[in-house]
């Protein structure tokens, strides 16, 4: 397994594993125990919460935020982290926000700035706030 290319200013926490060919951009935060597949590309300023599982050949655009807490954990003894999961070959556009527990299916695309509140099916494109599936044009 080759070492990832990690740009200056990135923070990679303890227990993170990388597949071959990963690139972590400037000022990216990769939380504890994240598992990244092969050829994952994470652009400038993205935030990956703890315990995320990211498949192979995933693109994460600049300033993407992945959250794992439905309710703030301060003074909440019932806190349970729910990291998003990204399957193989998906693309997350810049500035998108992935809320706790969502699964992004293989070959799915999340448009820039989308706020993903529910799972995204494989081969689907979602956009907007909240994210909704784009209608497909018949040509």
Q: Where are the language model's segments positioned?
A:
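Glycine-centered loop/turn positions within well-structured domains
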Residues: 122-124, 132
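Conserved G/P- and acidic residue-centered "switch" motifs that form tight phosphate/ATP-binding loops
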Residues: 110, 128
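Alpha-helical segments that scaffold the active site and NAD(P)H-binding pocket
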Residues: 63, 112-113
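A glycine-/small-residue-rich N-terminal strand-loop-strand element
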Residues: 2
């Amino acid at each position: 397994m080759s070492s990832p290319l990690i740009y200056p200013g990135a923070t990679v926490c303890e227990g993170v594993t990388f597949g071959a060919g990963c690139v972590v951009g400037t000022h990216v935060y990769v939380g504890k125990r994240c598992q990244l597949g092969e050829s994952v590309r994470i652009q400038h300023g993205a935030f990956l919460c703890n315990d995320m599982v990211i498949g192979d050949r995933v693109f994460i655009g600049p300033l993407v935020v992945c959250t794992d807490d439905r309710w703030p954990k301060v003074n909440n003894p019932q806190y349970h982290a729910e990291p998003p999961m990204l399957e193989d070959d998906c693309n997350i556009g810049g500035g998108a926000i992935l809320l706790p527990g969502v699964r992004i299916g293989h070959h799915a695309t999340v448009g820039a700035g989308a706020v993903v509140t529910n799972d995204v099916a494989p081969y689907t494109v979602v956009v907007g706030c909240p994210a909704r599936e784009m209608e497909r044009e018949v040509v």
